Amino acid sequence: MQTFAEISAIREQVKTFKREGRKVAFVPTMGNLHEGHLTLVRKAREYADVVVVSIFVNPMQFDRADDLNNYPRTLEEDLSKLGGEGVEVVFTPTPEIIYPEGLDKQTFVDVPGLSTILEGASRPGHFRGVTTIVNKLFNIVQPDVACFGEKDFQQLAVIRKMVEDLAMDIEIIGVPTVREMDGLAMSSRNGLLTIDERQRAPVLARTMRWISSAMRGGRDDYASVIEDANDQLRAAGLQPDEIFIRDARTLQAITAETTQAVILMSAFLGKARLIDNQTVDMVVETKEEESSEANSASAE
């Protein structure tokens, strides 16, 4: 496994792979790798001959200095895990390499609409930071395929939109969320939890499943459902942050045409901000079914 910190070095190596006719898959990470990240690596291997992983804690996407400073950094352990997965190349740049003139003078990439709703509304600039670094890493690595976790549902939607709008010749693969045995979504931030907090953390996923069950049971009073869910989180000692129930395709409000909804949740627990999501298939009556029901009612 080769490790590069300089842009020119990794570019030359990727060019060599391409000259050899090898397909390149890319997995961008911020390090502190867990089984969820390794699942992305394994999925990337299914699509390409070579897997490149980046480890870079991107300061542009953090809206709080303490969150950036507290983000776990475990480079040696990360490299050991990636070596065990047979990764060919790891890119480990510093902020000075990625942003040589600082953040204030950095050209940025902004996806309008999707970047400013939901989580983007409460974290101004967050998705701009994500799309800027992902775009820059794509330009450096020049992958054929890139894998992202579905746990960051809105982020994946934003990246897909960026790739589509900018006509990037990169296939984006969404990989299902990997969970602990108790249902908690795997996350680098889980390491910030105390033993007691870790025991309470699965309540987020359980509450999400309760919302899903309520929706499948026919509840469409979403504001009331969200209020009940927040009460469940508070009762378990979590501080609710955001809960959204939206159309999974557009991330807009659910309409009669919505065929799949998504529950987007976040909550604070100690020093950690936990996030999760779940899609819910909606029952949509066809015109034939509606007509049949109307005829039955008339006959009665």
Curated annotation (Swiss-Prot):
Positions of the catalytic residues: 37 (proton donor)
Annotated keywords: ATP-binding, Cytoplasm, Ligase, Nucleotide-binding, Pantothenate biosynthesis
Residue sites binding (R)-pantoate per the record: 61, 155
Localization (cell): Cytoplasm
Record's GO cellular component terms: cytosol
A biological process from GO: pantothenate biosynthetic process
Molecular function, one GO term: ATP binding
Positions contributing to beta-alanine binding: 61
Recorded metabolic or biological pathway in which this protein acts: Cofactor biosynthesis; (R)-pantothenate biosynthesis; (R)-pantothenate from (R)-pantoate and beta-alanine: step 1/1
Record HAMAP family: PanC (MF_00158)
Note: The reaction proceeds by a bi uni uni bi ping pong mechanism.
Functional summary from the UniProt entry: Catalyzes the condensation of pantoate with beta-alanine in an ATP-dependent reaction via a pantoyl-adenylate intermediate.
Record-linked PANTHER family: CYTIDYLATE KINASE/PANTOATE-BETA-ALANINE LIGASE, PANTOATE--BETA-ALANINE LIGASE
Protein name: Pantothenate synthetase
Annotated organism of origin: Vibrio campbellii (strain ATCC BAA-1116)
